[in-house]
Design a protein with these regions (language model features):
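Soluble periplasmic/extracytoplasmic beta-strand elements of cell-envelope proteins
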Residues: 102-106, 122-126, 133, 146-150, ...
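N-terminal activation segment of mature serine protease catalytic domains
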Residues: 29-125, 290-293
Length: 293
């Protein structure tokens, strides 16, 4: 069992990496933005432009001295605050239409190869105009300097505070300035075999939609405690942490969290013959509990 933390590991361990932040490289990015072709044609995602623009905006804000430090955010995270939210009643939208409320959540840092700021992107989504949900382990990255959020429309904000968190649930709710964006709708527990869609940012493939079914619910160990989790068959990888899992009516029923690789053999600590990859999510019931719903 592992989260993807953006660290280098052996090839045989790839699928059991931590599902947190995918590190942006040191090369410069050309300017650009998400381009919509209009009409019924889909928006065309420019991955290089997204990470480049987010990095430039984060750099500007870091150099201005405005952002809350990651040290302060982690201090808030460790206190595991709770918040009581009264979410407005709303209907879900098709997963592809909900992308306006899906965010890139990225740790901002300086690497050892240059003096520039970089962004290591993971996933998240709006549950209120000023609140973003992601995983606890996405925030718990002390090697980062601060945390930035980019919306689908290109706006970039620095995280102001952690308003709710649970290591056991692997969830964090972050406050950003009000966005004016309609948040996602939360659903109820999806039954086993239910169809689901996931939108996330695996390894900087931004706004990737994958589909599958709820495979099972099970008990797993997290923060030295037993907690229920949901497995799905929709694919995801590093950078997908915090991505919303939608049911067929466009309501969020889970949050992507981790992968677990099943190997047939293990010898001298080396795993071989990968057989299956399990994809684990946080059930929406735990998010509802965290925000007092």
């Amino acid at each position: 069992m592992a989260y993807i933390a953006g660290v280098k590991m052996d090839l045989a361990q790839w699928c059991s990496l931590f599902l947190a932040l995918g590190v942006a490289g040191c090369t410069s990015m050309k300017p650009g933005a998400v381009r919509s072709t209009g009409g019924t044609k889909p928006a065309v995602i420019n991955d290089r432009a997204i990470i480049g623009q987010m990095t430039r905006e984060a750099t500007r804000m870091m150099d201005s001295g405005e952002p809350v430090s990651m040290e302060s955010l982690i201090e808030q995270l460790k206190k595991e605050p709770r918040v009581s939210l009264k979410l407005p009643a709303g209907k879900g939208a098709p997963a592809a239409d909900a992308q306006k409320a899906i965010a890139v959540v990225g740790g901002v840092y300086k690497c050892k190869s240059c003096t520039r700021w970089h962004v290591a992107p993971a996933s998240g989504f709006l549950i209120a105009e000023d609140m973003v949900v992601t995983n606890y382990h996405v925030v718990n990255q002390p090697e980062r300097s601060s945390l930035a959020v980019r919306l689908f429309d290109g706006r970039v904000f620095m995280v102001e505070a952690v308003v709710a968190a649970s290591e056991r649930f692997d969830l964090a709710v972050l406050r950003i300035p009000k966005t004016g964006v309609k948040p996602v709708a939360l659903g109820q527990a999806a039954p086993v075999e239910a169809k689901v869609d996931l939108i996330s940012h695996p390894n900087q493939r931004f706004y990737t939609l994958t589909e599958g079914r709820v495979a099972r619910y099970f008990m797993m160990q997290r923060d030295r405690k037993q907690v229920s989790a949901m497995s799905i068959t929709a694919d995801f990888g590093r950078g997908s942490s915090g991505g919303p899992v939608f049911n067929e009516t466009g309501e969020v029923v889970g949050i992507a969290a981790s992968t677990e690789s099943l190997y047939y053999t293990e010898k001298d600590g080396e795993q071989k013959n990968l057989q299956m990859l399990f994809k684990h999510c946080v059930p929406v019931s735990q998010l509802r509990e965290l925000i007092g719903e």
